[in-house]
Design a protein with these regions (language model features):
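Auxiliary Fe-S-binding modules of radical SAM enzymes
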Residues: 1-50, 248-377
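Conserved, mostly hydrophobic/aromatic
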Residues: 34, 61, 89, 180, ...
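Short, charged low-complexity linear segments at domain edges
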Residues: 53-74
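Active-site beta-loop-alpha junctions enriched in small/polar residues
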Residues: 78-80, 130-132, 158-162, 183-185, ...
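Conserved Radical SAM active-site core
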Residues: 98-238, 243-245
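Canonical Radical SAM [4Fe-4S] cluster-binding loop centered on the CxxxCxxC motif
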Residues: 69-109
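Hydrophobic faces of well-ordered beta-strands that scaffold small-molecule active sites
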Residues: 73-77, 125, 155-159, 178-180, ...
């Protein structure tokens, strides 16, 4: 059974780096005028040569976004269920080597958090945990997903990679989507930053979206942690390769791409490569040209100023007022957080800023009486 690992083995990191850096202004202009991007076109739009074409790139990305999604921008919020973790990763506040207070929400905690989240108007929920299979694994998810499903119109997860059969079971319990970020597609760099635990297994993580596709999960989210490797352009191109593979092999699923940049955290590290805000805009817009139909997401890792200016260009999914620690909405304890969000505005403030620019915030885009895509056979 083929997976993206087979395609990944055909890709040479250094060759891709040289090809991206070798792209010319003519290559960029050809890509901007292409009706459908090739892999070479994507390299051109991620290249240094494309920096001089940012306005044209943004204009085309905005046109495609409006054509496909109108003026709508969906809102979601993360609910952190646990900061327990059995991995030791250099960049994460939840890393097992960090001496922080640990907490896992029980049924009563989840009810309080859910009430606080619903009071703010959110209907799209992203469930987040550290990676601790023994204490926050399938038994925990089986206990709590059904109650959460009754309260929210969309349930997605960002937890440890699971087996195909486990994803199929969670789908029946009401799970709609899974976000799984490879962190970096450079194997040696990956090994340097994942020191202990199951997350050391590069290929188990790399093949997770294949397992999601085979299990029929409705939405699959991809991304690289920008700044973890020494070349964000190559990592971003690898995300594009991963997306194209999945779209070809699991066309029934929908896809989402996120663009997380390293943020300060307990025991964190300095970025190995810096993507500035113009380069982040360049990357976001390149993905919109590559795949006009997918969801592009921007989290509260970015500043209010930046989000207010970039969301209208190509973003159609945003978080707001994110708390990155268990119990953060009902009882805020910052010492438990995974990383420090940059945009800490209330959701109504974010919505007002977008409405002022002619965009339509969407808090809910599905009703339970219509049935759930996650449960269709």
């Amino acid at each position: 059974m083929k997976t993206f690992s087979d395609r990944w083995r055909q890709l040479d990191w250094d060759d891709i780096r040289l090809r991206i850096n070798g792209k010319t202004a003519a290559d960029v202009e050809r890509a901007l005028n292409a009706s459908q991007l090739t892999r070479d076109d994507m390299m051109a739009l991620l290249s240094p040569a494309a920096s001089g074409y940012l306005e044209q790139l943004a204009q085309r990305a905005q046109r495609l976004t409006r054509q496909r999604f109108g003026n709508t921008v969906s809102f979601y919020v993360p609910l952190y269920l646990s900061n327990l973790c059995a991995n030791d990763c250099t960049y994460c506040g939840f890393s097992m080597s960090n001496r922080i207070k640990r907490k896992t929400l029980d049924e009563a905690d989840i009810a309080r958090e859910s009430a606080a989240i619903r009071e703010m108007g959110f209907e799209h929920l992203l469930l987040v945990t550290g990676e601790h299979q023994a204490k926050v694994g399938m038994d925990y998810f089986r206990r709590h997903l059904p109650a959460l499903r009754e309260q929210f119109s969309s349930l997605q997860m960002e937890v440890q990679p699971l087996a195909e059969t486990e994803y199929a079971e969670l789908k029946q319990l009401g799970l709609d989507g899974v976000m799984v970020y490879q962190e970096t597609y450079h194997e040696a760099t990956y090994a340097r930053h994942h020191l202990k635990g199951k997350k050391q297994d590069f290929f188990w993580r790399l093949e997770t979206p294949d397992r999601l596709g085979r299990a029929g999960i409705d939405k699959i989210g991809l991304g690289a942690l920008i700044g973890l490797s020494d070349n964000w352009r190559v990592d971003s191109y690898m995300v594009a390769e991963h997306l194209l593979w999945l779209q070809q092999h699991y066309w029934q699923s929908r896809y989402s791409v996120s663009f997380p940049r390293l943020r300060p955290s307990t025991g964190g590290i300095e970025p190995a490569s810096i993507m500035d805000e113009r380069q982040l805009v360049q990357t976001i817009c390149a993905f919109r040209l590559l795949a006009p139909e997918i969801e592009l997401s921007l989290s509260t890792r970015e500043s209010p100023w930046f989000r207010d200016r970039v969301i209208p260009l190509a973003i159609n999914n945003v978080s707001a007022f994110s708390k990155t620690q268990p119990g953060g909405y009902a009882d805020n304890h910052p010492e438990l957080e995974q990383f420090s969000p940059h945009d800490d505005r209330r959701p109504e403030a974010v919505a007002a800023a977008l409405t002022a620019q002619g965009l339509q915030p969407v808090w809910k885009d599905w009703d339970s009486y219509l049935g759930r895509a996650s449960q269709r056979l």
